[in-house]
Amino acid sequence: MSDLKSLATKFASDHESRKLLVLPTVWDTWSAGLVEEAGFSGLTIGSHPVADATGSSDSENMNFANYMAVVKKITSAVSIPVSVDVESGYGLSPADLIAQILEAGAVGINVEDVVHSEGKRVREAQEHADYIAAARQAADVAGVDVVINGRTDAVKLGADVFEDPMVEAIKRIKLMEQAGARSVYPVGLSTAEQVERLVDAVSVPVNVTAHPVDGHGAGDLATLAGLGVRRVTFGPLWQKWLADTSAQQLKGWA
């Protein structure tokens, strides 16, 4: 547990450093090893790429115990901090969720407000903040400074669900920050103007998803840094790029 506490403290400190963190999203020990060897200070595990790599599907369709077994293999294979995407929590209480990710060796979580196991119900803003607050409390009781990355799909869901998705996203990331999230993740941002509005709304790092080759709709890594972005992950995009590139190369051999 002492090593876990040290990793968590380092990860939390990295998030408070005001520097831009790039945390590539991995799915197995091979991809995790590549990230560590490349010199990154931490990594993220994505539910989507893990599901694709294990013959399952995303949206909380994986068996959680099996998922945590994958996480444990990855955390055992690297020496850098690992954060895991837990979607909306897989139906677990915040305390149980924190206990299980710590057991698997992770020191961060990404938790979203769309509950896939309940017909893709969107949690109310305060409900989601309360879930994050309870997870924060559970981590504090365990004595591990878990980095909670609070995700909202408000912008991604758009005007079909919210009258003003950007206003809703801002409300939600503020509540998540107040609840103890160390970073916030408003998915679906595609322009510099959107990114700036969200960055200006909170003091914690704002996470954006970027493509490892094509960057983000707002620009490349330097542009994102200039906009105030302090955390970048890849979601399923690195894995998809590898798959697409490999498929093109393999065609000549078929």
What are these regions (language model features)?
Residues 2-82, 86-236, 240-243, 247, ...:
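Alpha/beta enzyme core
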